[in-house]
UniProtKB/Swiss-Prot annotation:
UniProt entry tagged with the keyword DNA-binding: no
GO biological process terms held by the UniProt record: arginine biosynthetic process via ornithine; L-arginine biosynthetic process
Family: Belongs to the acetylglutamate kinase family. ArgB subfamily.
Protein's name according to its UniProt entry: Acetylglutamate kinase
PANTHER family attached to this UniProt entry: N-ACETYLGLUTAMATE SYNTHASE, N-ACETYLGLUTAMATE SYNTHASE, MITOCHONDRIAL
Reactions mediated catalytically: N-acetyl-L-glutamate + ATP = N-acetyl-L-glutamyl 5-phosphate + ADP
Enzyme Commission number(s) of this protein: 2.7.2.8
GO molecular function: acetylglutamate kinase activity; ATP binding
Any single Pfam family the record assigns to this protein: AA_kinase
Pathway: Amino-acid biosynthesis; L-arginine biosynthesis; N(2)-acetyl-L-ornithine from L-glutamate: step 2/4
Gene from which this protein is expressed: argB
Purpose of the protein: Catalyzes the ATP-dependent phosphorylation of N-acetyl-L-glutamate.
An example Gene Ontology CC term for this record: cytoplasm
Site (Transition state stabilizer) residue list: K38, K257
Organism field: Polynucleobacter asymbioticus (strain DSM 18221 / CIP 109841 / QLW-P1DMWA-1)
Length: 300
């Protein structure tokens, strides 16, 4: 039986008013601060959640915060690959990306998905601008080789998958200063102009670090980080995360997500959260209320 996930219609008018009143100190505290949001999962697929997300981002901008959206698009890439008879393959949470897959990734992320997000934000009254790593030299990347689990010391070539060498935040800051909302596709480029597919969690974490963000919020399809019994872990330190890596509790697609979140926390991002994007207005609930939500990642 599918568990009912709350929507805004489940909340009484009185509670809505209380939430607005509760938001005031957070609006003051985060005014002028940068909030980096990794947008992915069901929140990018279901129309109700897509509209909820767009409205949330616009509201954050209207009350004086500087939201920066870094989006994924795994399901959309898988669907596009399926149409040309290809199946996605992942190693350690990273998509193996041959030349044909890279062309699909560029088209889906930098085109279809990004345009959908930008158009939706603009439709509801915001001013969003889409970016890829090529725009303004935003994301400089090089080929990633990942360590083999089976053969220590050996590196695995997973194709046109990149790791971030540097981020030039000038174009993002310029857009923020002009009241725009940057929407960033996780595609990096080498000095030779080669495009690389970069995990969106890694881009979001590095962007939060470089922009000296107050918060990094990662939206997922689960309530947060779960233990082996399915219980939500609401607060994790670096030492606890290392233990979860070692015993296999954190694996697959969660590996780059948690690693990126922890790196951001260590770099000085004040608050790093992994939240359930399936809940309507989860972004506002995380940023503007006292409600403990999802998993907080701390460096110590």
């Amino acid at each position: 039986m599918t568990k009912h996930l709350p929507t805004i219609s489940d909340i009484s008018p009185l509670l809505k008013a209380e939430i607005l009143a509760e938001a005031l100190p957070y609006i003051r505290a985060y005014h002028g601060k940068t909030i980096v949001i990794k947008y992915g999962g069901n929140a990018m697929v279901e129309e109700r959640l897509k509209e909820s997300f767009a409205r949330d981002v616009i509201l954050l901008k209207l009350v004086g915060m500087n939201p920066v959206v870094v989006h994924g698009g795994g399901p959309q890439i898988d669907e596009a690959l399926k149409k040309i008879g290809k199946t996605g393959t992942f190693i350690q949470g990273m998509r193996v990306t041959d030349e044909e897959t890279m062309e699909v990734v560029e088209w889906v992320l930098g085109g279809e998905v990004q345009q959908d997000i930008v158009m939706l934000i603009n439709h509801f009254g915001g001013q969003a601008v889409g970016l890829t790593g090529k725009d303004g030299g935003l994301i400089h990347a090089k080929k990633m080789m990942i360590p083999s689990d089976a053969e220590p010391g050996k590196k695995i070539d997973i194709g046109f998958v990149g790791e971030i060498e540097a981020i030039n935040p000038a174009v993002v800051k310029a857009l923020q200063d002009d009241a725009f909302i940057p929407v960033i596709s996780p595609i990096g480029f080498s000095a030779e102009g080669q495009a690389y597919n970069i995990n969106a969690d890694l881009v979001a974490g590095k962007m939060a670090e470089i922009l000296h963000a107050e918060k990094l919020v990662m939206m997922t399809n689960i309530p947060g980080v779960m233990d082996k019994d399915g219980k939500l872990l609401t607060d994790l330190t670096a030492r606890e995360i290392d233990a979860l890596f070692a015993d296999g509790t954190i694996s697959g697609g969660m590996l780059p997500k948690i690693s990126s979140a922890l790196d951001a926390a260590k770099s000085g991002v004040n608050s790093v959260h992994i939240i359930d994007g399936r809940i309507e207005h989860s972004l506002l609930l995380e940023i503007l209320t006292e409600q403990a939500f999802g998993t907080m990642i701390r460096s110590r």
